[in-house]
Amino acid sequence: MSRVYNFSAGPAVMPEEVLREASEEMMDYRGCGMSVMEMSHRSKDFQDILKEAEQDLRDLMEIPDNYKVLFIQGGGHMQFAMVPMNLMKNRVGDYIITGQWAKKAFKEAQMYGTAHAIASSEDKTFSYIPDCSDLPVDEDADYVYICLNNTIYGTRFPELPNTKGKILVADVSSCFLSEPLDVPKFGIIWGGVQKNVGPAGMAIAIVREDLITEDVLPGTPTMLRYKTYADNDSLYNTPPTYCIYICGKVFKWLKNQGGLAAMKEKNERKAKLLYDFLDESQLFKGTVEKQDRSLMNVPFVTGSEEMDAKFIKEAKEAGFVNLKGHRTVGGMRASIYNAMPEEGVAKLVEFMREFERKNS
């Protein structure tokens, strides 16, 4: 069977070059006679993989020396807890609620202290990003938390919020490495890797060194302290070795693509193809305010659940898979992450155009 165009929100499409390389090295990694899956995490071979992956990520994002790169098991939901556990010195966190993942992080933080929702777009089903130029930031807030790109609803922050000097924490899971970020503007940048970077099972946290301390909430487990990972180069326990290996290959692939500035240009071209069609279509409609549209996740609807279901079924038969919207919102969603080729988006638009012609 030939490969399909996979528009899944995560786990998601991977660069074919990376998959081929991993396949070639599956039984014998660079002459060592074993798979990376079989390696000791204390071996020189794996430690070289880890160091190279970190350095390539630092190069791609231009991460300053006063930030630690941490490879952490557990994914995004664990970061919802780790952020307040490690940062809530005053037991206060301010949250900008722009979707379900920010809302879940907000609810998790309420278990550890006072969490304020200082802005929200829930009034219009998270179809826009609220004005963040003059937020009611609490003077005692330990940080301001955002989800930079909203996977379910297809919005992204067009510019960073004014945090009035407070630490900015960002969940970048679904836009990780899709465009350059000014790292020094953040205290913590974290992302689950399963959307745009690698296989499921890990998050990467980029944490400013002064925020990594022993001063965490009482009762914080060893494995939920950023310091545990920072002090041990992410090797306190057995890390997700194969996941790190694949992420490292993705970092090299991104470098070979020209880096994050080049990737942003490519992603803008892909998104424009799809949004331009949605704006002219009489059948399909986008669901997000134009100025806040995501480059990564594009939700759309026909206005009829029956027609949506027909489209999803016929698209799958034509080789365009995982276009069904999130279970909480319905409709359709095309996730067009870094590894989705421009050809894939162009062919999807062609299919949508033909579907509209047949069903108008």
Language-model regions, residue ranges each:
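PLP-dependent enzyme catalytic core of the Aspartate aminotransferase-like
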Residues: 2-4, 317, 326, 330-360
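A glycine-/small-polar-enriched, mobile loop at the entrance of the PLP active site in fold-type I
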Residues: 3-54
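Active-site C-terminal subdomain of aminotransferase-like
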Residues: 15, 193-275, 289, 358-360
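Conserved N-terminal alpha-helix of the aminotransferase class I/II PLP-enzyme fold
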Residues: 32-79, 86, 100, 108
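Conserved PLP-anchoring active-site segment centered on the Schiff-base-forming lysine
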Residues: 88-103
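Active-site phosphate-binding strand-loop segment of PLP-dependent enzymes
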Residues: 109, 121-176
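Conserved active-site segment immediately N-terminal to the catalytic lysine
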Residues: 169, 183-194, 203
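Conserved PLP-binding catalytic core of the aspartate aminotransferase-like
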Residues: 284-315
